[in-house]
Amino acid sequence: MQAMIFAAGLGTRLKPLTDTMPKALVKVGERPLLDRVIMRLKEAGASHIVVNVHHFSEQIIDYLQTNSYGISIDISDETEQLLDTGGGIKRAASLFKQDEPVLIHNVDILSNVDLASFYYHATANNSTTTATDALLLVSARTTQRYLIFSEGMRLMGWTNVSTGEVKSPYAALQGLRFEVPSETNPHALQHGYHLYAFSGIHAIAPSALKTMQEEEGEVFPIIDFYLRHCKKLNFQGEVKRDLKLMDVGKIGSLKEAEAFVQLRES
């Protein structure tokens, strides 16, 4: 397995902690977020990880040089310019093997996902006649922004249910209004489509990386890339119905995150 950890973010929602350190080194249960994600990936079988850096990049580099994980870890340096999630993958693409998917994991996400199984599905799907160009881990979590999938779980678009905005290359989705899925039946179809929340964990195949390299532009979100190309490339969603996920993006979520890891580690 090869993987990438998004650790370049500014961590503005974790201020004042991130006034003096990168979000990746904020501790949950006495361990930095970066350490937790690296160990999760290593335990899942990752032998090579790329970590992108920007905010207080030297602290992350020093941390990785000081702590040995027994696997190959490379740095993708965005110190001069933050490239956003899609641009970050594009910059780091040359550091990966070109014949297998890359598992992407946000540094501030804690979950109960079986990463080895998820990566296996991405790899297996990539070898079929209907190859999957990216596999996105999604769930029925309540939010305001959802990815829109066909009944067969192919990515079709994105919507903000608060504003009614829809982004999609498919004309059939234009003008449709979606609602927050029902708590009692969150997997029900709306206008023939599923709505699921993105988890910040996904696997991108070499075919999609090649398309990304052919595009102009260096700074762009990965979701925008997926939406631009979901008509010609096969981006699939994988639903984990019992997903337990913590987005450790706000000061107020740290105590909840500590309880989350204590429960998982008990």
Give the role of each language-model region.
Residues 1-5, 27, 31-106, 115-117, ...:
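Conserved N-terminal catalytic core of the sugar/cofactor nucleotidyltransferase
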Residues 10, 21, 56, 79, ...:
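A generic "binding-loop/recognition-motif" signal
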